[in-house]
Amino acid sequence: MVSAVFHSPLEASAPPVTSTHSPIGKAMSKPQTEAPAAPVVSARPSAASRDFRGVWMAVLPPVLGLACLVLLWQLIASTSNSGIPKPAETWAQALEVFSDPFYSEGPNDQGIGWNVLASLQRVAIGFGLAALVGIPAGFAIGRFEFLSRMFNPLISLLRPVSPLAWLPIGLLVFKGANPAAIWTIFICSIWPMIINTAVGVQRVPQDYMNVARVLNLSEWKIFTKILFPAVLPYLLTGVRLAVGTAWLVIVAAEMLTGGVGIGFWVWDEWNNLNVSSIIIAIFVIGIVGLLLEFALIKIATLFTFEEVKS
């Protein structure tokens, strides 16, 4: 016989009783306390620290490089008998030179500011003429194989010629120092624009030209819709190289032609044995060239071509 045991509803609803004598019961009877969570530290640096690091890495290396240059300059000037002035002496001379950079006491006695402006004017004229001739010539040479085979040997022959070799030709033909200097800038700065533009045209994908041929596009449409957008990064690279070449050439040309210009100013200071002014002119020439390069890079980055930005 099976006997059944019935519990009342009150007994069923009562909570279970745990013995406090057992270890489990003691543990359950004690109040549970949680340890405070450790603060979470982000492994990523903050935006402010990243910005500071970026500025620090952008400023510190150039400053250290300039400091090394000044230190080397000081050591050479102190240990040798070459007559090179020390940095402090050159700095004092620079303060005097730039106290009135635009004075004018005659056609051959002008401040360094007027000389730099005269050189920049010649560079602008010579470079502008070179761009007007060199860029279209580069497109034509790159577009037509016959012209490429025709002019490539001439470019390879004339491009390595020194600027000083072109200057006497300019003096002979133009009968003047200023046109001869502009001619020298023109003939020396035209080659980078021709070569880079032609290379850019030749590297346009052939599929683009095949599509243009299927659509029966005119040469003008091919130039404006296909060639120019594709060649623009190469063209801008050629322009940058040409400006640097033009600025290098004008200094050498003005040393020989005389008149007003930063090259003539350097040569005149050498005749006066003013070495401090020559060193100042070297820094001025470098800074102006750096500014020209920076301006062209900013112009190039206005376009969305990765080749230009890199």
What are these regions (language model features)?
Residues 183, 187, 220-252, 276, ...:
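Transmembrane alpha-helices
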Residues 125-155:
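Transmembrane-helix boundary motif in ABC transporter permease subunits
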